[in-house]
Amino acid sequence: MARQHKIEDYRNFGIMAHIDAGKTTTTERILYYTGKSHKIGEVHDGAATMDWMDQEQERGITITSAATTAFWKEKRLNIIDTPGHVDFTIEVERSLRVLDGAVAVLDGNAGVEPQTETVWRQADKYKVPRIVFVNKMDKIGADFDKSVESIRDRLGAKAVPIQFPIGSETSLSGLVDLVRMKAVVWDNDALGANFRDEEIPADLMAKAVEAHAYLVEAAVEMDDEAMEAYLGGEEPSEAVLKKCIRKAVLVGAFYPILCGSAFKNKGVQTLLDAVVDYLPSPLDIPPTKGIDFKTEEEVVRHASDEEPLSVLAFKIMDDPFVGSLTFCRIYSGKLETGMSLLNATRDKRERVGRMLLMHSNNREDIKEAYAGDIVALAGLKDTRTGDTLCDPLKSPVILERMEFPAPVIEIAVEPKSKADQEKLGVALAKLAAEDPSFTVSTDFESGQTILKGMGELHLDIKIDILKRTYKVEANIGAPQVAYRESLGRKVDIDYTHKKQTGGTGQFARVMITFEPGEPGSGFVFENSIVGGAVPKEYIPGVEKGLMSVKDNGLLAGFPLIDFKATLTDGKYHDVDSSVLAFEIASRAAFKELREKGAPKLLEPIMAVEVVTPEEYLGSVIGDLNSRRGMIQGQDMRGNATVVNAYVPLANMFGYVNTLRGMSQGRAQFTMQYDHYEPVPQHVADEVIKKYA
């Protein structure tokens, strides 16, 4: 069966927002109006179509990006629902990587919020074209102009309204379309399915003319012909104006701002029109870069069915009916069921068992898919998030890897029975495969299973899934901080390992220079020996020895990070030297760093933002200071005060309850990992005593 939709008619986009901006409701309405959903699901009653895990329906937040296909005006929309809670930033990064465009949803009452900034920065990183939908315009206190201002102030983005609301709060009746210079008014019944064009109300005409002129001036800058005509006194036609706005969106010159209320069914169809008119098709974005699997040279893949197959796995989910599902974006080529694929990232073979087109919670089996498609594959064995799948025979490729932040919080889990132990192993392996920001390891000394994640909520939800989905009974320890260690100074260490008492002995001498590296540089090993002081075949033993001990640290058993080890000299013995002897020597040299390298304990520092009513400001700041917080600044947002601070993660456990109690539930906070920094000596002494 040939391709049914031209690739230029695809819109692969995501909906991104702060936690309560109404993102899931907006997605629900899109599915309803595009005819995919027969009943509107409300987050308020836990029935939203996209939020299909129990944990999401209860908490009213979106945890996993479900991918859905829908149609609007002959265009094919692949919608990726992204979570808005900061503990799930990884999901957002991962979906932005495979999107071509995005709709940023703002709460018309709050404007740009902390998580909006985070997600916006991530979208900047991946250069994702976006449009903005100011939602909840029916809420008391909603203010469109203020929201637009907050985009300019807080995101530093050029915001250009292409609509503004008619009426506000409970009297919201529609919007002014500044491209067509018409009013669009919705009937209150028929669930928002009926709307009509009217002339712009007389009392809004002056505002509309001014806003239209601002839009036109920004738009014609994108096109020389339009600019010339405009300077000559000619008003651009609707088609020319749309073409210019589209150009601006594709290069990020400005961001069109739309408005409405998804909950009250107003403004969603005009948002869909804007998605079709302004967001990119796969042909509008730069070709995808990759590395040739064999030659390791850079190659590009254009969005075309004729090019060799290249597919990126961006999400793995455990589905109760199908088993493990791998969500994939096809960048080039054609994929068919039964095909044999190469996982180029891991050099493993895979076979496509079933291929599914997902609609949030039901699925359609398909036999083939093309460039631009987002599909779910069942039956893959070794593929993980971020892996590339391709045709083993036609110029295999590795697409660029996704980068995932390191987890900062950990808890110990102990199964209650032998049966639980077995179930726990299987369940954790699946959860770790689904989510790269969640890692599982075993503490060799205590034998405990350690789970690491991005925040308390992140781990809470994993524990919840273990208990509910996998029926594992386990005891959960208190959360622990993922401390790290670093070197305080550069030091040369000369160590000789010698065991020569009859028979084959062991001999290895290493001279290694250890030095602190830049933050984020990781562990770097270098061999600078010139000549044959240590034969080449023994060098890997030196590196292996260091690799085997660095994660146990020097002070309290935490990994030593960001340092460089340079092998500068050494000695060997013709008979008694071996790879193992050099491994033992480098391990012993490493241990001498405890005395000689001035090691330091590091702790994760979180960027914390608290939004609080004025009357609790003193208590909030006092409390943050008592947690070793460093206040970075404060400003006003509406009638609330925003406090920004850096606070050690160790002092943030249980903060949500303290803040709630202190402000009678009116203050909110978000936090995310920012950097590691040395722990003050008196605190370090306590930590070392506890863990060493």
Swiss-Prot record:
GO CC entries: cytoplasm
Superkingdom of origin organism: Bacteria
Boundaries of every tr-type G domain copy: 8-283
Residues annotated as transmembrane: none
UniProt keywords, alphabetically: Cytoplasm, Elongation factor, GTP-binding, Nucleotide-binding, Protein biosynthesis
GO molecular function per UniProt: GTP binding; GTPase activity; translation elongation factor activity
Family per similarity comment: Belongs to the TRAFAC class translation factor GTPase superfamily. Classic translation factor GTPase family. EF-G/EF-2 subfamily.
Binding site for GTP: 17-24, 81-85, 135-138
Record organism: Caulobacter sp. (strain K31)
One GO BP: ribosome disassembly
This protein's encoding gene: fusA
Name under which the protein is recorded: Elongation factor G
CDD domains linked to this entry: EF-G, EFG_III, EFG_mtEFG1_IV, EFG_mtEFG_C, EFG_mtEFG_II
Gene3D superfamilies attached to this UniProt entry: 3.30.230.10, 3.30.70.240, Elongation Factor G (Translational Gtpase), domain 3, P-loop containing nucleotide triphosphate hydrolases, Translation factors
Cellular localisation: Cytoplasm
Role noted for this protein: Catalyzes the GTP-dependent ribosomal translocation step during translation elongation. During this step, the ribosome changes from the pre-translocational (PRE) to the post-translocational (POST) state as the newly formed A-site-bound peptidyl-tRNA and P-site-bound deacylated tRNA move to the P and E sites, respectively. Catalyzes the coordinated movement of the two tRNA molecules, the mRNA and conformational changes in the ribosome.
InterPro entries: EF-G-like_DII, EFG_II, EFG_III, EFG_III/V, EFG_IV, EFG_V, EFG_V-like, G_TR_CS
Principal location: cytoplasm
